[in-house]
A protein has these predicted regions:
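Conserved, well-structured functional cores that handle cations and Mg-NTP chemistry
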Residues: 1-167
Length: 167
């Protein structure tokens, strides 16, 4: 029997954090891509694009990261649920302050999913953009994200999407 290859190490604290999620990935390449994306997101590169992240983490090209995000067999809902359970375990019933934030990003063009001319709160005006509602927790002076939902304008719904008004 061939022993499974170990994932390439990154930085100790990223390796330790990502280890909590290892069982969500069916192969070592997917788990490595998960770790590399974490490395890229905390790096000091200006734009967090897949080509830029692949360079900063030492990959020859961005294809492994692109594959991980587009066709890899991991479940985003399961990952979110697992992450929230980890947070609940760490909090151990201690109270948090809950913050709900509606944030918009201006977007050029209309090819990005759910982009529409709509009110963008942080710009203070109506513009072409995408809006997300995010829930954060504050605990002992630390702020961390809990979950988010992209607002889906009725005109831009895909098959199977459900329309909900903005909160």
């Amino acid at each position: 029997m061939v022993e499974r290859r170990q994932a390439k190490p990154t930085v100790d604290f990223i390796d330790e954090y990502c280890e909590y999620y290892r069982n969500l990935f069916s192969d070592v390449r997917g788990f490595e891509a998960f770790k590399f994306l974490h490395m890229g997101m905390i790096s000091d590169i200006k734009r967090k694009t897949l080509p830029a992240i692949s360079k900063v983490v030492g990959l020859d090209n961005h294809q492994p990261l692109h594959h991980f995000l587009t066709v890899s067999p991991w479940d985003t809902k399961l990952l979110k649920k697992h992450r929230l359970q980890l947070i609940l375990n760490i909090l151990a019933g201690r109270p948090i302050i809950l913050i709900i934030d509606e944030t918009g990003d201006k977007k050029k063009g209309k090819s990005t999913d759910y982009v529409k001319r709509q009110y963008i709160g942080n710009l203070g005006k109506t513009d072409n953009g995408i809006v997300a509602v995010t829930a954060y927790a504050v605990f002992c002076g630390m702020t961390f994200p809990l979950t988010f939902e992209i607002y889906k304008p009725r005109e831009r719904l895909k098959e199977g999407d459900k329309y909900l008004t903005k909160p």
